[in-house]
């Protein structure tokens, strides 16, 4: 019996390489890796800590800014709308993980920061997260990781140049 196995976009592109530029195949490979890793991280965060990836990401941003961040700054850093962020912040304030105060420089803006409870819980999650990521890239040598970091920095600069209009 011939079973149809669904393919990811990268595999489809490889089947007819004449139909795709190498840059497209590269983008699809990056997307496949990101989707695979992000899905596993989401699953593990939910199973181990009962939290979502957006909650983890928000707490990570605030852990890097002990003085706190405005909702506007948080939404820029996380690349989400203020509306998406507001409900999550409200839930974390209600559970005691975040504190909210009025900005000293702009009375219209609210600044949120991790509480002691929030910071302790985030750091426990971050430790596990780091271990998981290490496990997922565990078959790469130190040299391969360094080379990928170098190449991805160049890819980011190239994409940034194109996005920001430096090239057409």
Say what each PLM segment does.
Residues 2-6, 12-14, 90-150:
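Charged, amphipathic alpha-helical coiled-coil/dimerization segments
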Residues 35, 39-81, 95, 164-168:
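N-terminal helix-turn-helix DNA-binding core of bacterial DNA-binding proteins
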Residues 47, 64, 80, 99, ...:
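Conserved amphipathic alpha-helical interaction elements at protein-protein interfaces in regulatory
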Residues 1-49, 168:
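N-terminal leader segment of winged-helix/HTH proteins
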Residues 23, 27-45, 122-141, 145-159:
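Hydrophobic alpha-helical core bundles mediating ligand binding, dimerization, or RNAP-core interactions
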Residues 23, 73, 105-107:
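Short, solvent-exposed coil/turn segments
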């Amino acid at each position: 019996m011939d079973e149809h196995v669904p393919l990811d976009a990268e595999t489809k592109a490889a089947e007819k390489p004449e139909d795709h530029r190498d840059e497209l195949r590269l983008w699809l490979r990056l997307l496949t890796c990101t989707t695979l890793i992000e899905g596993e991280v989401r699953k593990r965060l939910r199973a181990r800590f009962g939290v979502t990836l957006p909650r983890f990401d928000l707490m990570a941003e605030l852990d890097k800014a002990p003085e706190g961040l405005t909702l506007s700054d948080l939404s820029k850093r996380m690349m989400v709308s203020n509306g998406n962020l507001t409900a999550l912040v409200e839930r974390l304030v209600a559970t005691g993980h975040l504190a909210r105060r009025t900005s000293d420089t702009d009375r219209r803006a609210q600044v949120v920061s991790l509480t002691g409870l929030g910071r302790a819980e985030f750091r426990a999650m971050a430790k596990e997260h780091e271990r998981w990521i290490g496990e997922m890239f565990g078959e790469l040598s130190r040299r391969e990781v360094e080379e990928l970091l170098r190449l991805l920095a160049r890819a980011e600069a190239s994409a940034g140049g194109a996005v920001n209009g430096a090239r057409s």
